Amino acid sequence: MRILGIEGTAWAASASVFETPDPARVTDDDHVFIETDAYAPDSGGIHPREAAEHMGEAIPTVVETAIEHTHGRAGRDGDDSAPIDAVAFARGPGLGPCLRIVATAARAVAQRFDVPLVGVNHMVAHLEVGRHRSGFDSPVCLNASGANAHILGYRNGRYRVLGETMDTGVGNAIDKFTRHIGWSHPGGPKVEQHARDGEYHELPYVVKGMDFSFSGIMSAAKQAVDDGVPVENVCRGMEETIFAMLTEVSERALSLTGADELVLGGGVGQNARLQRMLGEMCEQREAEFYAPENRFLRDNAGMIAMLGAKMYAAGDTIAIEDSRIDSNFRPDEVAVTWRGPEESVDSYRMGGDEVQGAEATVHFDGDRVIKVRVPRSYRHPTLDERLRTERTRQEARLTSEARRNGVPTPLVRDVDPQESRIVFQRVGDTDLREGLSEGRVADVGRWLARIHDAGFVHGDPTTRNVRVGGRDEQADRTTLIDFGLGYYTQEAEDHAMDLHVLAQSLAGTADDPETLLSAAEDAYRTESDHADAVFASLDDIEGRGRYQ
């Protein structure tokens, strides 16, 4: 099989030829050729008009170069009249003017050789190239690119967004900082270079469940430079903060799903510090990590051709009249036809006396639970100590506060912030994700309403952080645990964020997430004194994810 791939979502005009006897796996006979002509603005960031002009000039050239590459290679059954089996192109997400040029070129080549057309989601291609080349079965994927940052996991025929940026993409955030200090695009490599000579400078650390935000970090970083902090120190602080956030949410996704494989995608993934952090985190929790080589991390047509081959083999092609582009094409909108419905990132099984959570080790000792936030070697020591100490104190405080407000939580028996250690009463038989039901999820909605009315949030109300079960009449009892990301707030938006995190965790772990979420929301409305304001904020939050 030989597939021509065409990429041009923003800055990289790229074409590729992917040859393989089996698109489902890596073979010794695989061959990938990539030709790329990257747009580089004279100053500032990417300008859509200039980028489109570049695509108009460069796409025909890189496509012809890729087609010429097929000449001299083995034809199909001795017939060289059509040197490719299909044309795959990036339908989105991306800049509309650039995408239209790519789509036009793809249609022209498909008609020229009378071969099928395959429309590929750019972000899913970032994921699939890592899954393909790693040989992993069903990994969690961190996509860290210019306009995007999200955590994906496969379940029930689609890639589910387990977490994502709530404002700007990670690469764009870094570029905004570098433009502020007069550095040219792209800014990421320059930040990486200067960070090597810098000392850690503290910046805001924003993780909410498995979502994250970068705008506050960038504002603080720009202000720090303006205030005279050495730029090398600010760059070091940016790397240590942003990449620790991405690594933490990746670990939270592994913990939520029980997966033991992680792949990295996206151009920001070329950063060596980020790769080391992710590798250390996975090693610490005995998971496998894979980062493709750089030519497959940055925007490239090779990943488009590889995913195109999988889709073509599954019969997932489109007619030319249906091949319109979608500049807001979210990865969770893609019907994943090339994977079996029985596959899932969901492999979690509870068992044993010790459990590795997202940021702590939990040991069961009779009627006690001993939770220790062990040091995370991937984080800068100063940042790591601050987070572990703050979260230990906050968890103990809010667990007791929730209990005083009528929410079932375990008794706190001992706290040692210096050792990041808490001893709790043991509650429940298993996690909610192992015993999902409408009634139990409705209880979670009810408990969240009570703590919100009391003036604080849970911070991470996933199906891993609710214990269920008990003896006799308490068999359906639900108990909230792990308030480490919680904080005091009266803001409706902060309360809505709890509901958003719950919704994401249900999407990643439940077979019928919509029904379960409705049960939680109905119970919340009944219990809360401020439901209207909270749900208005929730609508706003859900419109902020990339390409909503």
Swiss-Prot record:
Basic and acidic residues compositional bias, start-end: 390-404
Kae1: annotated span: 1-338
Gene Ontology biological process terms in this record: tRNA threonylcarbamoyladenosine modification
Binding annotation for L-threonylcarbamoyladenylate: 143-147, 175, 188, 192, 271
Matches recorded under Gene3D superfamilies: 3.30.420.40, Phosphorylase Kinase, domain 1, Transferase(Phosphotransferase) domain 1
Record-listed E.C. numbers: 2.3.1.234, 2.7.11.1
Segments crossing the lipid bilayer: none
Any one cellular-component term (Gene Ontology): cytoplasm
Record keywords, A-Z: Acyltransferase, ATP-binding, Cytoplasm, Iron, Kinase, Metal-binding, Multifunctional enzyme, Nucleotide-binding, Serine/threonine-protein kinase, Transferase, tRNA processing
Compartment annotation: Cytoplasm
Keyword Disulfide bond found: no
Coiled coil: none
UniProt-annotated stretches for the region Disordered: 390-413
Active-site residues from the entry: 460 (proton acceptor)
Chain ranges of the Protein kinase domain: 349-548
Residues bound to Fe cation: 122, 126, 299
Pfam families hit by this protein: TsaD (PF00814)
Amino-acid positions noted as binding ATP in the UniProt annotation, renumbered to this chain: 355-362, 371
Cofactor info, note text: Binds 1 Fe(2+) ion per subunit.
GO molecular function, one term: metalloendopeptidase activity
Subunit-structure text: Component of the KEOPS complex that consists of Kae1, Bud32, Cgi121 and Pcc1; the whole complex dimerizes.
UniProt record similarity statement: In the N-terminal section; belongs to the KAE1 / TsaD family. In the C-terminal section; belongs to the protein kinase superfamily. Tyr protein kinase family. BUD32 subfamily.
Main function: Required for the formation of a threonylcarbamoyl group on adenosine at position 37 (t(6)A37) in tRNAs that read codons beginning with adenine. Is a component of the KEOPS complex that is probably involved in the transfer of the threonylcarbamoyl moiety of threonylcarbamoyl-AMP (TC-AMP) to the N6 group of A37. The Kae1 domain likely plays a direct catalytic role in this reaction. The Bud32 domain probably displays kinase activity that regulates Kae1 function.
Protein name: Probable bifunctional tRNA threonylcarbamoyladenosine biosynthesis protein
Species the sequence originates in: Haloarcula marismortui (strain ATCC 43049 / DSM 3752 / JCM 8966 / VKM B-1809)
